[in-house]
Amino acid sequence: MALFAASLAPLNLSFDRRPFFLRRCATTVIRCAAEKTPASRRSAIYQPNLWGDDRIRSLTVEEEDRTATARIKLLKEKVRKVIHDDKEVEEQLQLIDQLQQLGVAYHFKDDIKDSLSSLHASLEDISLKFKDNLHASAVLFRLLRENGFSVSEDIFYKFRDEKGQLRDCLGKNTQGMLSLYEASYYEKDEEMALHEAMEFATEHLKNVLEEGMESSDLTREKVAHALELPLNWRMERLHTRWFIESCQREAAANVNRALLEFAKLDFNATQSVHKKELRQVSRWWTELGIARELPFSRDRLTENYLWTVGWASEPEHWRFREEQTKANCFVTMIDDVYDVYGTLDELELFTDTIDRWDINAIDGLPDYMKLLFLAVFNTTNEATLKWADLCKAYLVEAKWYHKGHTPKFDEYLENGRMSISSNVMVTYGYCMAQELTKHDLERFSDYPAIMLPKSRLARLYDDLATSKDELKRGDVQKCIQCCMLERGVSEDVARGQMKEAIKANWRSVNGDRGSVSSSFEEYMKRLVVNMIRTFQFFYQDEDRYGKADGETENQVFSLLINPILL
């Protein structure tokens, strides 16, 4: 059931009877007393919060440097001039690719769109020009697909031999293999040429590492980085830092000096914005005080903020990040109530109260649930229906657990795409959009296509990483166990099938993220894709949310605290 999970062990839980206050609309104070003697419940020992408010407030927040601001503006115009300078098509593609991987493409959205539109209009001629250039063809294909332009996999047919297979000699070109590999992960359903290209490129890149075919350490690093995770699946902000530092290490990197300096300054300036936001939401969370009153739940304010940076890192999306962080905190707390602490009777009452969204309906709830409902009610009143849907999905899984029921795989996944909280997340992204219009509001129901595979991917990533720990505490059977029981296969086979399901759902996402009719639709689809990428980061090989030390702590430092050296 868990959106985020942790390793568990028995926990002795007791509340002092002390008042707890929740402030509503800055004027009304709603008061509730914490319960004195809880019922017999399941419990968990979660790792403690690593980022208390004192630690966050101690972080150095750089004051705005007018000299640095002026330098950023100057470099931005220099880069814009470089974009508009006459250049060969391959140089143009390389520049656009660098703008995206360096994390500064958002400054030049219109310039990039105009350039790609021009290239797309001449696609047939350019493809002929690149008849022997696999690297350039693959970059062209990837950039067009990534930015919503229609381009067929047929662009790679010219690299096949008389038997219809990719020519073996192509494997000797590591740069071409890297570009083909990255392009292949933008495949859609039933694109066999791209599927074969993915297998071909993967095999040859593995040989590069295993047989020492490349003498350059940096080239081997790039190959290992790609094989660990393709660009299309990576959390953008994490890759941006890696790519900037990779360009710094590579003396011969073919990156414009002004562009690289601009990318470093922009990264650090954006990080300062994030740091200030983190301090603000940390103060809100501390003053709210609910984490102290409900200690059975995971306290993950900083990690919840990191999720939002993965979804929309640009400074202009500050309001979304702040409000979504608050929602993430409540999702975690509600998830732990359903997974760990609440009795079935209490959960049914709580679900009904959330569904009714009536402040007068809380009298029948136990005191700890009153606290939780009031916190959610006072903070997130805009997304009422989505919170109700989430709690209903949680309740379904709670009933499965209490009845000892193992659902069919499809039944589990259908409910799981709701209990993973995707709809709550996307609703916040929708409501906090910068360019939201009445027309966009009227079209809200027009975006379900990309949401279905997105929600399934989130559930699959979560279950693959957290199921072992959750089952140890006696949680409901996960998709792996449902698959094992229904199909009569081993856990290893079931996990393999889940990984194939991940690829299949990514193909659906790629098919649904094509052409857009407005900047708002473009923003929403990009937000959804970035949500998937961030889920992948938090559940890559292990539960990096529940076990918040290790890699997650490292990336908090990398993205939110330590600036790039200039």
PLM features: residue spans?
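Terpene synthase/cyclase
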Residues: 2-566
